[in-house]
From Swiss-Prot:
Stored InterPro entries: Ribosomal_bS20 (IPR002583), Ribosomal_bS20_sf (IPR036510)
Function: Binds directly to 16S ribosomal RNA.
Recorded GO CC terms: cytosol; small ribosomal subunit
Gene3D superfamilies (UniProt xref): Ribosomal protein S20
Family affiliation: Belongs to the bacterial ribosomal protein bS20 family.
Protein name per its UniProtKB record: Small ribosomal subunit protein bS20
Keywords associated with the record: Ribonucleoprotein, Ribosomal protein, RNA-binding, rRNA-binding
Swiss-Prot/TrEMBL GO biological process terms: translation
GO molecular function: small ribosomal subunit rRNA binding; structural constituent of ribosome
SUPFAM superfamilies: Ribosomal protein S20
């Protein structure tokens, strides 16, 4: 339990940020899932559209320290490679 005023305030700020970060993480996961679903269906156009939405969300999440930047880059890279395979 926080004793000082500043520690209590920090606890409140952390709670607010946690709610916001959970929301952003959920949106990001949904965007990635939509790309993966389009890839499973073999629909390249839908996958490209979904990827255009998912990539900025992943990079924004990395920028805001919701996920690590290498994690975001790895996900973008893997999804891009899977979409490229659909063209073949």
């Amino acid at each position: 339990m926080a004793n000082t005023t500043s520690a209590k305030k920090a606890t409140r700020k952390i709670a607010r940020r946690t709610i916001i970060n959970k929301s952003r993480r959920t949106q990001m996961r949904g965007a990635v899932r939509s790309v993966e679903d389009a890839i499973k269906k073999g629909d390249r156009e839908a996958a490209l559209k979904a990827m255009a939405n998912a990539e900025p969300q992943l990079m924004r999440a990395a920028q805001r320290n919701i996920i690590h930047k290498n994690n975001a880059s790895r996900k973008v890279s893997r999804l891009t490679h899977q979409i490229a395979k659909l063209a073949k």
